[in-house]
Amino acid sequence: MIQQESRLSVADNSGAKEVLVIRVLGGTGKRYASIGDKVVVTVKSAISSSNMKKGTVSKAVVVRTKKEVKRADGSYIRFSDNAAVLLNNNDEPRGTRIFGPVARELRDKQFMKIVSLAPEVL
């Protein structure tokens, strides 16, 4: 369960290392984000040689959460960290590589580019 002020690690090579959630997108009173939800984030730490500087505001999609997600077949999936992938204005990933596994739920939410770049889809 990702909410405002949650810190997420970044699972791509956009240059940011850690981000802070400013807002959960998707409705007036939406409080929590899960896998596949879009959030507005600000960069808290970044690689010095990248164009993503500290304080940059961007959109991101949540790709891993510690909170388990129930699937239609009754099984659950959870990850060891909370992670996001940064998006550009066209909702495409800013980076060209994705690190670590991502959930299959991203395919249902039409983030096919992230699914195709990921090394493993669970």
UniProtKB/Swiss-Prot annotation:
One of its GO terms (biological process) is translation. Keywords: Ribonucleoprotein, Ribosomal protein, RNA-binding, rRNA-binding. GO terms for cellular component: cytosolic large ribosomal subunit. PROSITE patterns: RIBOSOMAL_L14. SUPFAM superfamilies: Ribosomal protein L14. It holds the Pfam family Ribosomal_L14. The keyword Ribosomal protein applies. The keyword Chaperone does not apply. CDD domains: Ribosomal_uL14. Gene3D superfamilies: Ribosomal protein L14 (2.40.150.20). GO terms for molecular function: large ribosomal subunit rRNA binding; structural constituent of ribosome. InterPro entries: Ribosomal_uL14 (IPR000218), Ribosomal_uL14_bac-type (IPR005745), Ribosomal_uL14_CS (IPR019972), Ribosomal_uL14_sf (IPR036853). Part of the 50S ribosomal subunit. Forms a cluster with proteins L3 and L19. In the 70S ribosome, L14 and L19 interact and together make contacts with the 16S rRNA in bridges B5 and B8. HAMAP family: Ribosomal_uL14 (MF_01367). Belongs to the universal ribosomal protein uL14 family. Binds to 23S rRNA. Forms part of two intersubunit bridges in the 70S ribosome. This is Large ribosomal subunit protein uL14. It comes from Cytophaga hutchinsonii (strain ATCC 33406 / DSM 1761 / CIP 103989 / NBRC 15051 / NCIMB 9469 / D465).
